[in-house]
Regions:
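Active-site glycine-centered loops adjacent to acidic/histidine catalytic or metal-binding residues
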Residues: 29, 53, 75, 138, ...
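Short loop/turn microsegments at loop-to-beta-strand junctions
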Residues: 80-81, 131, 136-137, 181
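Gly/Ser/Thr-rich phosphate-binding loop
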Residues: 1, 10-70, 82
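Residue-level recognition of short loop/turn positions
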Residues: 87-89, 98, 144-145, 179
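Short beta-strand-to-turn element immediately C-terminal to the catalytic PLP-Schiff-base lysine
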Residues: 61-65, 86-87, 103-104
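Conserved ATP/PPi-binding loop(s) of AMP-dependent carboxylate-activating enzymes
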Residues: 77-80, 91-127, 165
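AMP-binding/adenylate-forming catalytic core of the ANL superfamily
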Residues: 2, 103, 111, 124, ...
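Hydrophobic alpha-helical segments, especially N-terminal targeting/anchoring helices
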Residues: 86-87, 95, 136, 142
Length: 194
């Protein structure tokens, strides 16, 4: 189910439903706040297995069945893809550093499931396909165990006093408050902080 559905689920009294036939709970499409994971597990006993993919990539990162998910992590790269996190200069990021999720392409051939370009739009295709990589436009960090943690879209980062702030990170902290059901963070220009 998409993350929006899980946010609706946790607002319901799930104890009045027979969920015994559900063996797995998966999600992708947008980041899911850890608080939603925790509330859903508390209500159902199920751990949501998060993943990441795009229309252009299919599922490229996931908490696959048989793996031990880390709550809030998208999981690990699919064996189909050589996923790396790159800094703005095209260098691989160190563990814990934020960078763009990219897929390395060998010999100029896209792996199975990865698109090869936008229909009749070479300019847009060239924006995402360059230097031997497909650039997703999404940012993440990779931890010491190889799990990826979603930060946000590159074009959705808020800059304040020279700091880069991911709205999802702030939303996740706010969602932990017991009296908050939903929240959204957006940037607003400030004359002093930018």
């Amino acid at each position: 189910a998409p993350p929006t559905m899980y946010r609706f689920f946790i607002k319901e009294d799930l104890s009045k439903y027979d969920l015994s036939s559900i063996e797995y709970a998966t999600t992708a499409g947008e980041a899911l706040n850890p608080e939603v994971f925790n509330q859903f597990k508390k209500a159902t006993g199920l751990t949501i297995m998060e993943g990441f993919g795009q229309t252009e990539t299919t599922l490229s990162i996931a908490n696959f069945v048989g793996s031990t998910p880390k709550i809030g992590s998208m999981g690990k790269p699919s064996p189909l893809y050589d996923v790396v996190i790159l800094d703005p200069d095209g260098n691989e990021c160190k563990t814990g550093d934020t960078g763009e999720i990219c897929i390395r392409v060998k010999d100029g051939k896209a792996p199975c499931g990865l698109f090869i370009g936008y229909y009749l739009d070479d300019e847009k295709t060239n924006e995402v396909w360059h230097d031997g990589f497909y650039h997703t436009g999404d940012q993440a960090t990779m931890d010491e165990d190889g799990y990826l943690w979603y930060v946000g879209r590159i074009d959705d980062v808020i800059k304040s006093s020279g700091y880069r702030i991911g709205p999802f990170e702030i939303e996740s902290v706010i969602m932990e408050l017991p009296y908050v059901l939903e929240c959204a963070i957006t940037g607003v220009p400030d004359p002093v902080r930018g």
